A protein has these predicted regions:
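Carbohydrate transferase catalytic cores enriched for Leloir-type hexosyltransferases
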Residues: 1-384
């Protein structure tokens, strides 16, 4: 008998962030495993197809969201959740072989055995890096979602330990299932890079790169301050390239980069589609990711898979992901980060070593294994 997996696929609606990538890669692998029958919920629309773009009928959900959000933000979150929950429950069949997987923190209240993926606890650890209305809503609802779940999945062992400590759960109720870089993330051949980088006006090996949504938690301000302390000659030759869509509270970042943008030393690319990222990673002289807090941290792993030497902060899950395959610095140590960037930019031998070690480490992470371990969680909660 097939296992029916009811999956809230709303994070797949473009543009996809890290959670959207998690959904797409996990479900793509699960579809290739026999005995799994997936069903996808797209914010009010059910489908048995794994969609890579938003269906047009989702526009009604977006209109509803905009309308209620104009009233009271906290109320808007609650109304959206209840409205979607009702539509979700209309499409499920409660059988002896069915499970509901919520990949994005807050589970609907359903009669099915429930698995929730909690990617991080940044809403509790760094509330100042989130909008106030989101903090208010999530702080109250996240605990309810976690306690309601039959099993909680964390992206890392670091995250698992945080959840266990915060919510005082039995160890068997929380499982760490590591993520991976997508199959498209691999080194791009040197002869192909000029054409791939031309739309961004970049040359292979001649830029420092950072990728991620622009928001306070990503700590790009520290990275920019560190870059600004590099010798002028380096900055004139090797710009700092920032790829990622705007999140919130970017005014400080905008002020920080204005002068360097004017000099051409910082390039902001905005949102970069998934298919363009391997080329960007492969051509980077150095990849920098000084995040204050991550539940996993996909961009450094993607960068390593593409052969970019990486520098990350030594906080949260990032040491677990990168290990000794990259340089680690304190997230708020501007001088330390500047020193690491300067060293890696100028040391050909170190870059080559980290490039090789990074590619080898990235091979140890697999979406197939992620899917198999997630499926084991499904079967565990279904059988009780």
């Amino acid at each position: 008998m097939s296992l029916n997996v009811y999956f809230n696929a709303a994070p797949l609606l473009s543009p996809k962030t890290g959670i959207g990538q998690y959904c797409l890669n996990l479900m793509s692998e699960l579809e290739n495993i026999s005995g799994v029958d997936p069903h996808y919920f797209y914010g009010g629309v059910w489908s048995d197809e794994l969609l890579r773009q938003a269906p047009t009928s989702v526009s009604a959900t977006k209109k509803f969201k905009r309308t209620v959000a104009q009233v009271i933000p906290d109320l808007a979150y609650g109304l959206q959740q209840r409205w979607r929950g009702r539509h979700f429950c209309k499409g499920i069949a409660s059988t002896a072989s069915a499970v509901y997987h919520e990949p994005n923190f807050l589970a609907f209240n359903t009669p099915l055995p429930t698995v929730v993926t909690v990617h991080d606890l940044s809403i509790l650890r760094y509330p100042e890096t989130h909008p106030r209305d989101r903090v208010s809503f999530m702080t109250r609802r996240l605990g309810e979602s976690i306690r309601r779940a039959d099993c909680v999945i964390s992206d890392s062992e670091y995250g698992r330990q945080e959840i266990l400590a915060e919510y005082n759960l039995p160890p068997e109720r929380v499982v760490s299932v590591l993520l991976a870089a997508g199959s498209g993330f691999s080194p791009v051949a040197a002869e192909q890079l000029p054409a791939l980088l031309a739309p961004f006006d970049l040359q292979s090996g001649q830029y420092v790169l950072s990728v991620g949504t622009l928001e306070p938690r990503k700590n790009l301000t520290t990275a920019i301050k560190a870059y600004a302390r590099l010798p002028e000659a380096i900055r004139q030759e090797i710009p700092f390239v920032i790829a990622g869509m705007k999140g919130w509270r970017t005014d400080g970042l905008d002020r920080e980069v204005a002068a360097l943008i004017e000099k051409g030393q910082i390039r902001r690319l905005g949102y970069v589609p998934d298919e363009a990222l391997p080329g960007l990673y492969s051509g980077a002289r150095v990849f920098v990711y000084p995040s204050l807090y991550e539940g996993f941290g996909l961009p450094p792993l993607e960068a390593m898979a593409c052969g970019a030497p990486v520098i990350v902060s030594n906080r949260s899950s990032l040491p677990e992901v990168v290990g000794d395959a990259g340089l680690q610095v304190d997230a708020l140590d501007v001088d330390g980060l500047a020193e690491a960037m300067n060293r890696l930019i100028g040391d050909d031998v170190l870059r080559a070593s980290l490039r090789q070690r990074g590619m080898e480490r990235a091979k140890g992470f697999s979406w197939r294994r992620c899917a198999e371990e997630t499926l084991a969680v499904y079967r565990k909660v279904v059988t009780g």
